Amino acid sequence: MANPSKRIINKKSKQASISSILNFFFFYIMEYFVAVDNETSLGVFTSMEQCEETMKQYPGLHYVVFKYMCPADAENTDVVYLIPSLTLHTPMFVDHCPNRTKQARHVLKKINLVFEEESIENWKVSVNTVFPHVHNRLTAPKLSIDEANEAVEKFLIQAGRLMSL
């Protein structure tokens, strides 16, 4: 006869598995509609503090946070651009997953709205990958700033090619 406590543990682990699968689909769908259908990010911010406040409102999501210094701005103000992870899970996401090119185009389109007067080549870009919450799903590498900058350069070149298709 099976041990009753073992049965309870098995039942709990099945419930946990089902719960994590449901969470995955909930966040996947939510990110899809936020990031792709509406062609939007969660916001454009002038400080990391504003950015962090917004991230606290969405504790279940991963983000890629782009920080731009716009050369057209006389005061060279830093602008922080917050993008949900499904759109761009890491700066190299589009290289790993070619069917994400549609999302990459949307991201570039949105960024172009912010920096209409500047071409991609003229942007000064730095990037931080931010993980406010850990899921058992896609795991992005934690990049150093140098690695991230290099990855972003490659991404922008790749995305620039996609935009011209």
UniProtKB/Swiss-Prot annotation:
The keyword Transmembrane appears for this protein: yes
Protein origin, superkingdom: Viruses
Covalent S-S links between cysteines: none
Induction and repression of expression: Expressed in the late phase of the viral replicative cycle.
Any Gene Ontology CC annotation: host cell membrane
Topological category with respect to the lipid bilayer: Single-pass membrane protein
Protein source organism: African swine fever virus (isolate Tick/Malawi/Lil 20-1/1983) (ASFV)
Protein name: Uncharacterized protein F165R
Family, similarity comment: Belongs to the asfivirus F165R family.
Residues spanning the membrane: 16-36
